[in-house]
Swiss-Prot record:
InterPro entries assigned: ATPase_NBD (IPR043129), Gcp-like_dom (IPR000905), KAE1/TsaD (IPR017861), TsaD (IPR022450)
Location in the cell: Cytoplasm
A Pfam short name: TsaD
SUPFAM superfamilies recorded: Actin-like ATPase domain (SSF53067)
Gene Ontology BP term (one): tRNA threonylcarbamoyladenosine modification
Native source species: Nitrobacter winogradskyi (strain ATCC 25391 / DSM 10237 / CIP 104748 / NCIMB 11846 / Nb-255)
Keyword Protein biosynthesis: no
Annotated keywords: Acyltransferase, Cytoplasm, Iron, Metal-binding, Transferase, tRNA processing
Gene name as annotated: tsaD
Entry's EC annotation: 2.3.1.234
Binding site for Fe cation: H115, H119, D309
Bound cofactor: record note: Binds 1 Fe(2+) ion per subunit.
Residues binding substrate: L137, A138, S139, G140, G141, D170, G183, N281
Protein name: tRNA N6-adenosine threonylcarbamoyltransferase
Amino acid sequence: MLVLGIETTCDETAAAVVERLPDGSARILSNIVRSQTEEHAPYGGVVPEIAARAHVELLDGLIARAMTESGVGFRQLSGVAAAAGPGLIGGVIVGLTTAKAIALVHGTPLTAVNHLEAHALTPRLTSRLEFPYCLFLASGGHTQIVAVLGVGNYVRLGTTVDDAMGEAFDKVAKMLGLPYPGGPEVERAAASGDATRFNFPRPMLGRPDANFSLSGLKTAVRNEAARIDPLEPRDISDLCAGFQAAVLEATADRLGVGLRLFEERFGRPRALVAAGGVAANQAIRASLEGVAAKARTSLIIPPPALCTDNGAMIAWAGAERLAAGLTDSLETPPRARWLLDANAQAPAGFANTRAGF
């Protein structure tokens, strides 16, 4: 089974061809990613209109490269998959419309992939992992703990009630004057900092649910930074180290609860899996080893290039859905919001927050 995957939900334009073999294993035949960092850097964050226009300019060329590198012709494709959401709607429209055109012209089945499902299934692209497993999804737009029970079968066990983890890293970087994209810059600065200098809060620690909150921690960093004038490089490193240490401790606690909830409902997970751009953070990757060991399960984290947004994960999710007999109509709409767990409810008291979607 050969599938072309297209990713345009945020600020990466990507296309890939993945082969799903009869035994369920995979081969990545091509995986082309073009980051839009240069386009958005002057603004300190992603500008949706600029992102959408860049996708329009870049996508056709990237698809051509992905097809050429894979050695596969359009008529050989078993399916074409595109991220149909959630994401910045302009970019989602570009990718999904392009996939529909390819499907229509070549008579190829279309799969409209939930971007979060693609992250959830990526470990099966790299590790031959069987269901069920526990997913920690941490990116610029989402922070969730999810029970992955099968293709199309997901139960959300915990979510952020305010900032996503990647968003918090980026905002801390911006308030400290670090370059965009901020997450890797915070990680880099934290490596040489003193994590004990500032006593930052550990949000949601000890709660019986598995939800996250990072807004208060972000504010605490801002308040400490405001007390220091001038803000020297050493101060920035210490602030980043303290912030990251607080995130690590809170994450370990939240995941501990999430894994317990998983086991109570579904039995012991086959693995703890981390995905999303934040999973590329080396300190977080190291911290999760201890979390998995405490829960007596293994830890699986895809290579960093497959944690961040890419076309291979979309192609693989499309292949998984095709193998399960799932295809989509050419009338399938793009979605800015799209729950991975369609039955997920916002935590009590947080119905009007991002936890509701």
